[in-house]
Amino acid sequence: AGKEKQKTIWLLFILQAQSLFLTFLIGSFETGSYSNIIAFFEITLQDQQRLTNSYWQNNALFAVFNLISRQTHPSFPQFLASIDAVLIDRLSELALNTNFNTDSQVWIIDNAIYDLNTIYKYLPVWQPTITLALTDVLSTYPYLSEPYLWAVRGVTQNSDCVNLSIGQICLSTTKNSLKAVAFPNTYSFDDGIQVVYTPLSLASIQPLYHALKQVESQFFRLIEILAPVSGDPTDTISMYVYGSLRDYRVYHPFLFDMATNNGGIYIEKDKSFYTYQRTSAESIYTLEELLRHEYVHYLVGRFIIPGMWGQGPVYANERLTWFDEGIAEFLAGSTPKEIRPRKALVSQIQYDGSSRMNVSQIVTAHYGDFKFYRYAGNFFQYLYTYKKDVLRDLIRALRDSNIAAFDSLVTQMSQDMSLNTSYQSYLNSLVLNVNTLTNPVTVAPDLANLSTNDPAVIQPIFRTTSTGHLAKCTTAAFRMNGRFSCRGMITGSLRSSPDWIAAWSELNSGINNLISTLETNGVNNFGSMNCGMGEIYFNKSSNQFYPLALYSCEGPLAFQTPISYSRPTQDQLDFRDTTFGVNSTCFTNPNPTLGTICNSSIATISFPKTATYDEMYRFLNWQFNDLKSEVFMMRPPLYKRMNCGLNSITTVIPNQTTGDKYLTATSTCSL
C-alpha cells in the first residue's frame, strides 16, 4: 500500500508539472504553483530511480526546468518575486548530483545549471550564492565536460574572466581549449579561401572539397556570372565540421551561442558554416549532402544577392525562404556534367503520399517545418528541366535587387494552376523512378599521382579541343590542392531568333563534350575538371543570331610551391590577358587600404542608328561582366576582394551620315 501511495503521489506531481507548464503557456502563474515546483524537485531527489526509462517522468521534469528558465524574466515579476533560497538549493542539489552524470541523464544537471545561470542573470541579489554553487560544479565535474561548460557560462556572465576560490576562470580561454579538442585539425584549401576545422582526417575531407567544386561549377552555369556581387565581404569561408552529433550538441552552443536543432547552418556575417559527421541512424542526409547544401547558401550570398542574409527589404516576410532552401537542395545534386534529382528528397515525397505541397504553398513557405525543403528542391529541379528561363529571370531579379520583378514572377507561379499540375506530374515521374535515383557520393582524385603541376602542360592539351582551341590557362591555387584554370569563349549555332533556352542547352552540351573529350586524356588532371559558364549574349549576323559566352574550367594540379605575385604588375598582366581588358592599366592606390586599382576602357561593337540605348547597354554590361568574371576565375585567391564598377558611359557617333554608334565606358576595379 505504501508503494502504491508513493506511486500515486509521483503521478500527481507529473500531472502538476505538466499543468504548471501549461499555465505558463497561457500566461498565468499561481503563487501556490511555486511550492509544487519545490516539492517536485524534492521528490525527484528522493526517488531518482523513477526517472529511469520513464518518458513521462522525464518529460515532466524537463517541463519544470523549462518553466523556470522562461518565467525567470522581467516579464514575469510574480514568479521572480517567488524565487528564494530553497529553489536555488534544490537546483544546486540537482546540478551537483553526480548520479545524473550519465549519457542519458546529464541533461538534468545541464538544465539545473542553466536555470541557475538564468536566475543569476535576472536577480543579482542571488549572484553570490549561485557563484558558490557553480564553483562547486566546476570542482566536481571533469574539465570541458557538459556541466563544466554550462558552469563557465554562468560565472562569466558579467566579464570574460572571474576569480573564484578554485582560481581564475575565463570564458575565452575555455573556448580556445574546447576548440582545440573539437577541431584538432585545420585544412586550408584554395590558398585560404576555404578553411575546414574538424577532428576528421584529411582523407575524409578531400572528397567533400571536390564535391563543393562540382556544386560551384553547376551554380555558375545556372547564374551565368562568375564574379562576386559588388562589395561582397565574404571572400573566405570557414567550415566547422564536428566529429559527431553529440559533439555538435554539446560543444556548438558553448562555442558559438547557436541552437543545434538542425543538420547544419551557414551564418553569412561570420563567413562560416557549421555541421557534423553523422551516422545513417542520426540523419537521412550524409555529411556530403549537408556540406553541399550549406555551400550553396554561401555561393548565393556571394554571387547573387547583395548585402548580408536577412538584411534589407528583399528578405522581408521570409520572401526568400523557399528560394534559399530550394536552390540549396537542388544544387546539392550537382555532378561535373549535370544536376541530378536526389533519392533522399524524392523518397520523402513518396512517403508523403497524398499530402504533398503545391506550388503556392512552396513559394510562401516559412521556416519552422522542414517539409518544404524537399518540395522546393524538386521545384527548382522542375524549373531547371522545363522552364529554365523562369529560373534565369528569378536569379537575375535577385542579382539586380529588383524585388518587384521577383515578386511578380513568384505571384505568377503561385497562381498558375497548370504549372502546379505539371509540377505534380513531374513529382509522380520522380516517385515512380525513385529506385533509379542516387545520392551524391564524390571520389577525390589521387592528388599524389596527378600527371602535372604546370598549367603550361594543361593549356596545349586543352587547345586540341574545338571548344578550347583559344583557351588560356593559369595556376588558380597552389599547395597540396593546387588548381588550374582555363578560360575562353564558347559559341553556338546560327539561329533565326535569340532563343536563350536553346542556346543555353547547346552551350551547356558543348562544355560537357569538352569535359568528356579531356577526361580520357593521358593527363589525369582532367579527370576531375569542372566547368562553369558566363552570361549568354546573342550576336546578330545577317538577320540571324549566334550565342556566345565565357566558359571557365578548373581542376587539380599536383603540389606546387606558392609564388608571390608582384602587384600591380601581375594585375595588369592578368587584366590585359582577357577578351575585353587588353587596354587595362593598373596602379597602386595612394590609399594603401584600397590596394590596387585597375581601369579598363571598354567599347561596344557598332550599332545601327535605330539601336536603342538599352540594346547597346546590354552588350556593354555583358562585356563588363565578362571582364570581371574572366579576371576573377584566373586566380580566385588573388582577386577574392575584387570590387568593380562601370562609369563614364558615353555614346559615340563617329559617322553622322549613317548614324552608326557605340558605347564606351571605363571599368574600375579595386583589388
Task: Kindly label every feature range from the protein language model.
Residues 1-166, 363, 367, 435, ...:
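Non-catalytic all-alpha helical scaffold/repeat segments
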Residues 86-238, 242-271, 359-373, 385, ...:
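Non-catalytic architectural context of zinc metalloproteases
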Residues 201, 205-212, 281-292, 320-325, ...:
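Solvent-exposed, acidic/flexible segments
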Residues 216-223, 294-295, 299-307, 331-336, ...:
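Sec/Tat-exported extracytoplasmic proteins
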Residues 220-236, 306-310, 341-344, 391-398:
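Surface-exposed patches in mature extracellular/periplasmic domains of secreted proteins
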Residues 269-346:
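Zinc-dependent metallopeptidase catalytic helix centered on the HExxH motif
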Residues 327-335, 347-436:
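Active-site-proximal alpha-helical
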Residues 404-574, 581, 593:
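Beta/coil-rich, acidic/histidine-enriched accessory regions frequently appended to metallopeptidases
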